[in-house]
């Protein structure tokens, strides 16, 4: 089977997670500067079989799109143009940063490590992907 890639898109940094080949478990991959994201994905897709890409959908509590959506939409258009064979799906990303911080706290990370924004983005992408994978099982 192929992998699924999840993206927690940010203006400066973007967290990336990937599934295992059985598409059961999400693993954090890395965080990349957003301006390098398309090239990073291109390199990854060239090395690994990828079935689809999941994008964290930023919504406000009232279910409206957040301010960051205006940055995500042009990126998704570029992504679909460069990789037309890869389906792109959105997953609600509300509370992923809160869950990422809670995960780091429960894992016993020191305060300095919990302040690492790149790690928060990577864990958020992992949560987005795991949410997607679990939704497909049931």
UniProtKB/Swiss-Prot annotation:
Q: Which InterPro entries match?
A: RNaseH-like_sf (IPR012337), YqgF (IPR005227), YqgF/RNaseH-like_dom (IPR006641), YqgF/RNaseH-like_dom_sf (IPR037027)
EC annotation? 3.1.-.-
The top EC class, named as a word, is hydrolase
Which SUPFAM superfamilies does its entry note? Ribonuclease H-like
GO function terms (MF aspect): nuclease activity
Tell me which GO cellular component terms the UniProt record holds: cytoplasm
Quote the subcellular location field of this record. Cytoplasm
BP-aspect Gene Ontology terms: rRNA 5'-end processing
Keywords, sorted A to Z: Cytoplasm, Hydrolase, Nuclease, Ribosome biogenesis
Q: What is its main location?
A: cytoplasm
Task: Name the source's superkingdom.
Answer: Bacteria
- Functional note: Could be a nuclease involved in processing of the 5'-end of pre-16S rRNA.
Give the protein family: Belongs to the YqgF nuclease family.
The protein's name is: Putative pre-16S rRNA nuclease
Per the UniProt record, the source organism is: Bacteroides thetaiotaomicron (strain ATCC 29148 / DSM 2079 / JCM 5827 / CCUG 10774 / NCTC 10582 / VPI-5482 / E50)
